[in-house]
Regions:
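Catalytic or ion-translocation cores adjacent to nucleophile or general acid/base/metal-coordination motifs
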Residues: 102-104, 110-133, 150
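Conserved short loop/turn motifs at secondary-structure junctions
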Residues: 93-100, 131-135, 159-162, 167, ...
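Single conserved hydrophobic/aromatic residue that forms the stacking wall/gate
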Residues: 2-7, 11, 257-267
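Non-catalytic terminal/interface segments that mediate subunit docking, oligomerization
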Residues: 1, 5-88, 95-116, 204-215, ...
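General beta-strand structural signal in soluble alpha/beta enzymes
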Residues: 24-26, 65-67, 91-93, 127-129, ...
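Core nucleotide-handling region used for phosphoryl-transfer chemistry
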Residues: 247-259
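A short acidic (Asp/Glu
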Residues: 34-37, 101-106, 136-140, 169-173, ...
Length: 267
């Protein structure tokens, strides 16, 4: 079975093999803030970095990953422009923690959520915002999801909170391949990176697809249905198992915004 960080590497390899270039930028993206990625290996004697995925580079179809300076506004603005003029590539900007995206709020308001309406400018920029309350302090817990949801209108952006490796794989593959470019905001996991319950089978990557909603059926006829998203699902599931409750059904929302999400919730 695969954990989330492994699936993150798999989608990059698959996209490169399929001819889609990938570019990742963030303050700690090469190693990964939670020491989960390690896409650049350094020689301890020379300090030279080696990127294993670069072996899959073919001409302009290449993999690039950069550790950026500590200016969210500057880097996000640059990556927005990069994604806008480079439709064939998957461009990802990653906040070290989701909270830090507030420093770049002007870029989000002026360009990411409104450029299509104002100037007919499309962008497939993807934002990775590590999200979750794991006791790391008040500035390391929330990407202020409510602000992004307030900015949603007329399918201007996509907001997703995948909790399984297969979901991450299919979501980002879809973002790269889809010719209809829309900014994608992904609330990426923190503690779930190493949660043994948050794993996927290899077959889920090869045969599955991204699921907007995941329903965990109760063993008996359900008396209650609980709607949730993100890591809260695993907290609820643990409690259900601990109490041996068999009549509660959990419905997990993975796609929080596009009109498709609203239609599916109504159904």
């Amino acid at each position: 079975r695969l954990i989330s960080s492994a699936a993150s590497d798999v989608y990059k390899r698959q996209l490169l093999k399929d001819g889609f270039p990938v570019r990742v930028t963030g303050q700690d993206s090469r190693r990964g803030t939670f020491s989960h990625r390690h896409l650049v290996v350094k020689d301890q004697n020379t300090g030279e970095g080696f990127v294993p995925l670069s072996k899959l580079n073919k001409g302009n179809k290449k993999f690039e990953i950069f550790d950026s300076l500590l200016s969210e506004e500057a880097v996000l603005g640059f990556e927005y422009g990069y994604a806008s003029t480079w439709p064939e590539g998957l461009v990802i900007w990653e906040a070290q923690f989701g909270d830090f995206v507030n420093v770049a709020q002007v870029i989000i308001d002026q360009f990411i959520v409104s450029a299509e309406t104002k100037w007919n400018r499309l962008s497939g920029l993807t934002l990775f915002l590590p999200h979750g309350y794991e006791g790391q302090g008040p500035e390391h817990s929330s990407c202020r999801l409510e602000r992004f949801l307030q900015l949603c209108a007329h399918d201007n952006i996509q907001i997703c909170i995948p909790t399984l490796p297969a979901q991450i794989f299919h979501l980002l593959r879809k973002q790269a391949i889809n010719p209809s470019r829309k900014p994608l905001v992904v609330l990426t996991p923190k503690s779930l990176l190493r949660n043994p319950q948050a794993t996927s089978k290899i077959e889920d990557l090869s045969n599955g697809t991204f699921r907007n909603i995941i329903i965990n059926k109760s063993k008996n006829l359900p008396k209650r249905v609980v709607f949730c998203s993100g890591k809260v699902f695993f907290d609820l599931q643990d409690e259900i198992n601990k109490l041996k409750v068999k009549n509660i059904e959990l419905v997990r929302f993975c796609l929080l915004y596009t009109s498709d999400a609203a239609d599916e919730m109504r159904r």
